Swiss-Prot record:
Organism of provenance: Homo sapiens
Identification of the protein by name: Olfactory receptor 13D1
Glycosylation sites per record: N37, N300
Keyword Oxidoreductase part of the UniProt annotation: no
Source species taxonomy: Eukaryota, Metazoa, Chordata, Craniata, Vertebrata
Subcellular location per the Swiss-Prot or TrEMBL entry: Cell membrane
Cytoplasmic side: 79-86, 153-171, 250-269, 325-346
TM annotation in the entry: 58-78, 87-107, 132-152, 172-192, 230-249, 270-290, 304-324
Family membership noted in the UniProt record: Belongs to the G-protein coupled receptor 1 family.
UniProt gene name: OR13D1
């Protein structure tokens, strides 16, 4: 049997010390490298649609024109709902909230998008990306709740007109609008904080035209189970349950409209609800395509086009739809414009 001498024990001890030192040093270097990668994330590069350089100027002009239409149309709708006393009702109060929401939503995404279209670098700061995400998620969630609230308002107005002023009193409809904003802001804040706290491991190229949460999560190199779970629950509530409530409201509304004997009353009810239903189809159609379809590793051009539609086209069309489909809004617009034109002539 071999017996260890003092010399052997000394050599083994020295060898183990070297191994321990080398392992500790390697772990420290790795930890330092990871910390450096995590802390060095100060900006992101948005490369969505950059594979079509010949379209950058066209997209810039298109989005700029749409943005001006959004600001003009939604601002006009807000102004007439304030100035015209006939529009001081819950329905137009919610419509004013929707117009203000569309202005805020597009103002958070379109100006940075315009800069990126004309920029060679196509970068956005970490803070700017987080702010864009929290605003877009918050206002998107708020719009889901607000559209459901508007559907309930239509339901009460058509199915229970005699008690409408009692049910939709001033306190209730202001609280409903306020809670729409609060719920949207809280859900977006939670999702944004949980996403921006994740390690990106130096990968800062976002394959999208905005800081969209799904595109950003593809850059994460750690477990995103909690993020996916929260996003799934939020999407089910915002996109499925609320859409189902809107659908149920319209089933009752349609059955009540068909029982109206007066042709003029039936036409007015249809015109009021048709504008809201078109807005719901546009908004939820784009949102369901973006957030509920099977996800792929790479972002498709169709995803970016739908994202552009979701963030630009719908807010642009909302005031146009409500103006064309609503007689009271058209009359209020004519009244406000004629008054200002008369003042200009004087």
């Amino acid at each position: 049997m071999y017996r260890f001498t003092d010399f052997d024990v000394s050599n083994i001890s020295i060898y183990l010390n070297h191994v321990l030192f080398y392992t500790t040093q390697q772990a420290g270097d790795l930890e330092h490298m990871e910390t450096r990668n995590y802390s060095a994330m100060t900006e992101f590069f948005l490369v969505g649609l950059s594979q079509y350089p010949e379209l950058q100027l066209f997209l810039f002009l298109l989005c700029l024109i749409m943005y001006m239409i959004i600001l003009l149309g939604n601002s006009l709708l807000i102004i007439i709902t304030i100035l015209d006393s006939r529009l001081h009702t819950p329905m137009y109060f919610f419509l004013g909230n929707l117009s203000f929401l569309d202005i805020c939503y597009t103002s958070s995404s379109i100006p940075p998008m315009l800069i990126i279209f004309m920029s060679e670098r196509k970068s956005i700061s970490f803070i700017g990306c987080a702010l864009q995400m929290v605003v877009s998620l918050g206002l998107g969630s708020t719009e889901c709740v607000l559209l459901a609230v508007m559907a309930y308002d239509h339901y009460v107005a058509i199915c229970n007109p005699l008690r409408y002023s009692i049910i939709m009193n001033g306190v209730l409809y202001v609280q409903m609008a306020a809670w729409s904003w609060i719920i949207g802001c809280l859900t977006s804040l939670l999702q944004t904080v949980l996403t921006m706290m994740l390690p990106f491991c130096g990968n800062n190229v976002i394959d999208h035209i905005t800081c969209e949460i799904l595109a950003l999560l593809k850059l994460v190199c750690s477990d995103i189970t909690i993020n996916v779970l929260i996003m799934t629950v939020t999407n089910i509530v915002s996109l499925v349950i609320l859409l189902l409530l809107i659908f149920i409201s319209y089933v009752f509304i349609l059955s009540s409209i068909l029982r109206i004997n007066c042709a003029e009353g039936r036409k007015k009810a249809f015109s009021t609800c048709s504008a809201h239903s078109i807005v719901v189809i546009l908004f939820y159609g784009s949102a369901l395509f973006m957030y509920m379809k099977p996800k792929s590793k790479n972002t498709n051009t169709s995803d970016e086009i739908i994202g552009l539609s979701y963030g630009v086209v719908s807010p642009m069309l909302n005031p146009i739809i409500y103006s064309l489909r609503n007689k009271e809004v058209k009359e209020a617009v004519k009244k406000v414009l004629s008054r200002h034109l008369h003042l200009l002539k004087m």
